[in-house]
Amino acid sequence: LTRDWSSDVCSSDLVDKILKAFYLVYNTLGYGFLERVYQNALYFELIEQGFKCEVQKQINVFYKNHKVGEYYADMVINNSIILELKTADALRPEHEFQLINYLKATNIEIGYLLNFGKHPEFKRKIFSHH
């Protein structure tokens, strides 16, 4: 089960700070850098605000109790939110499915796609494990 609220900003203080950091990094650096540059800047911004940030966190994928592969999430914040960063012209469905698969493979239910493209944009994805 997935739900999509592209422009709905959760009232959560955590999410508010993450999105403010995203826009601060975008507005400071502007458009045109590689994804890694934005990832490093966002990491430093979130660490400075006191968040626990894991970068390129390995997510194992299992099939019938056998490990069949792994993904690497761009960032995991406070063990509760996955951030997937992009530098695309626009977010596409395959970006959304990538994030949904990360959520499926973990106990984390909330993820954000953050696009540092020509125009900053984000999408929130929620995957319920129940």
Give residue spans per PLM region:
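Single conserved hydrophobic/aromatic residue that forms the stacking wall/gate
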Residues: 1-9
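Nuclease catalytic cores
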Residues: 12-16, 31-35, 39, 43
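A short, surface-exposed helix-loop junction/capping segment
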Residues: 18-28
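Conserved catalytic cores of phosphodiester-cleaving nucleases, focusing on short active-site segments
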Residues: 30, 53, 73-91, 102
